[in-house]
């Protein structure tokens, strides 16, 4: 009986071993070329750094299958214009003011439309050189659109041969990929009235900050209310200011000079520093007695502004903080 059981077990092991050899030694899936994207054919996982010389994003072509290719596979791309229309219809219907746009030609270079997926590899990365991103609006959505040339790349997946490459941008202070909010702390907005009295508001809300260039951001000048950011573009354009960071302060290496500028038509005047409202950017590290540290990116501002020439100036003393983890940002 023991001999019979031994024979059965040995036979089973031989069969399993044979199956393992078949599973791992042979290709189990058809090899097809795909363009990396989500279920909506959008690829939005990359962010362009606003910096001198621009930055590089990639359109990624991948090869399906359980085994790496043993010979090069040529992938040829083409420009396309079908997905953007569908994207706008699906997301914004007839609200044309919010339609996504193609990135202007002056803002990118696409050096090659043909690459190989090398033998032993599973992907090819088409570089997109981005530049002049400070010229595009932080309030608009921008894409580049490509598709696989199926005549010159015959083994492509027809369901994954198109891609919309979303153009996000960021600098050290803010990003368009995820909304960046700075919180008002110990801030006041002084609103004069024609009768000579002034109303003092103490905002405790947050202010969304947008990257403009490598060293500048945009934000609302005051505490004006608007119900929905996506429908308040005119108010935002008229009521926004630019903060432009400059040289490091010699007396404090964690602080930088800061200049306050108009974004569009707003009348803004940078005022003489008062106490901690000294028109600087500060990397503020607050330490507790037990040794823990909390890190803030902080704008310390003193200015006045008005939206129309007939308005009285509103004076702002603001400290805007954004808490962050430097270890996470440096990953």
What are these regions, as identified by a protein language model?
Residues 20-112, 125, 129-143, 149-331:
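Intrinsically disordered, low-complexity regulatory regions in eukaryotic proteins
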Residues 15-18:
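C-terminal motif of bacterial Sec signal peptides marking the signal peptidase cleavage site
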Residues 118-125:
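Beta-strand-enriched, solvent-exposed domains that form extended recognition/catalytic surfaces
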Residues 2-10:
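Sec-dependent signal peptide recognition
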